[in-house]
Structures are given as C-alpha cells and as structure tokens.
Amino acid sequence: MTTAKPPPASEAYRSQAGHYDRRTDAFRQWRELLVASLPLRPGDTVLDVGCGTGLCAPLLHRQVGPAGTIIGIDESEQMLAVAAHRVTEHGWDNVRLIAAPVATAPIDGMADAALFCAVHDIMQSRAALDNILAHLRPGSPVAATGGKQPAPWMWPLRPWVIRLHRPFITDFTGFDRPWRLLAKHVPDLQVRELAFTAGYLAVGYTPGVRQMRKPMTNKAKQSLTKRAMRKHARGHSVPTRALLSGY
C-alpha cells in the first residue's frame, strides 16, 4: 500500500492567497519581531524572501523609507498579485516584486539585508539560500522566523504543530532546526526559541564588515536581539497566539 504524497505548499498558497492575510493576522507579532531584529537604515535595500502577500512590506518601508528599496520574491503569482495591490494602495514606488522561485530569482545588484518570514521550504533549499546570500553585501544583517518542531519535553504539542503547518510546508525535513543551512552562511547566527519551543527567531550577519558603518560587536548584536524579544515577545502569550494561525 502506498501513501499519496502531500501536495506541494505552493498549491496551498495559490488557493488561499485571497484570504491569507486574515488567516495569518495573529502572526503579525512575529513579523514585527523579525523586522525589529534587523538594524535597517533609511536608504537600505532589503530582500523579503518568500514575501507572499507583502505583509512585511509596511514594516520594512517604515525602516528604509522612500529612499530605500524593498525587493519581494515569491513564486506564487496569486500571492504576489495581492502584494502588488498592497503596494499600489500605499503608493510605494520603491517596492519591486519578483515572481520566480527564490533559487533562480533574477536579483539585480547587491542588498543590505534579508529576511525570511515563515518560509520553511525556502530555508531548506541550498540553492535558494545561495542565491540570496550571493546578493548581500559583506556584513549584512539576516533574520528568519517561523515554526519548528517543539522540544522533546513539549511532545504533546508536536502533532498539533505538524497539523497546523502541513498545508504550507512541502517537506518537514529540518523542522527540528530550520535555521541549520542558513547558519552555514551566517556563522554568528543567534537563535531564540519562541512559543514554548514551537517557533524561533534567528538573527546574524554575513561575513565581512559592512561599509559606511561601524561594525557591531557580538555583545551589541546580542543586545539588539534581546531588546527586540523583550519588546515584542514578553513571556509566551504573543507567540502562542501567533502559532494558532499557522503561516
């Protein structure tokens, strides 16, 4: 007897693009935490990897301003159509949307930062990470957040977490440590677990020194992450509510 493989996550995103924002509204606290962990400056160019409907764009635009550039990448044309409507509605002329798999997305020039918000399949793709990291300047901040397999001592949560994320993840390989491949590109990657170990925030910098800025010490990087955590995730109440919505 053979078991049918689950449909790729891209089908779920395609079918749910119209109401994706409503379904993931509770997850906004994680998005805020993610963007707050990036030391963005006005005028920066940031890569929003697997941007979906563009829910991170307002937060990013607030940081980089009209002089900055936001490049959203997603292979779902249905999700990007919603993102394009959001961009038009806000009148942003500095947001570029690329409809392509992240591994082969044609990214022009170099960016100053990248974020990965609830994109497990992309985080497990070496080719996707290679393409993104190849377009980041030395010393660029990188941040990722999403769900993960709860720790063994939280085993009652495991079936529930898997069921919650199954529509949006094609392959659960690496779900115990979703950041493992990213850590190979970002040697100083720091990881904090969220939602009773069922979620995570990973923040680090690409190797090298970022130009036109005094490089941050490890102590300063740790302080930045801790401040973001205290501001957006006091206790476990916020991440737990966010977890209810899945991606």
Regions found by a protein language model. Name each.
Residues 169-185:
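Short alpha-helix
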Residues 113-126:
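A short SAM/SAH-binding and catalytic strip from SAM-dependent methyltransferases
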Residues 103-114:
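A short acidic, Gly/Pro-enriched loop at the edge of an enzyme's catalytic core
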Residues 47-49, 53-103:
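Class I SAM-dependent methyltransferase SAM/SAH-binding core
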Residues 1-39, 160-165:
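Conserved class I S-adenosyl-L-methionine
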Residues 128-138:
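A short glycine-rich, Lys/Arg-flanked "PGG" loop and its adjoining helix->strand segment in the class I
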Residues 139-147:
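Conserved beta-strand signature within the Rossmann-like core of class I S-adenosyl-L-methionine
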Residues 187-215:
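Core SAM-dependent methyltransferase catalytic element
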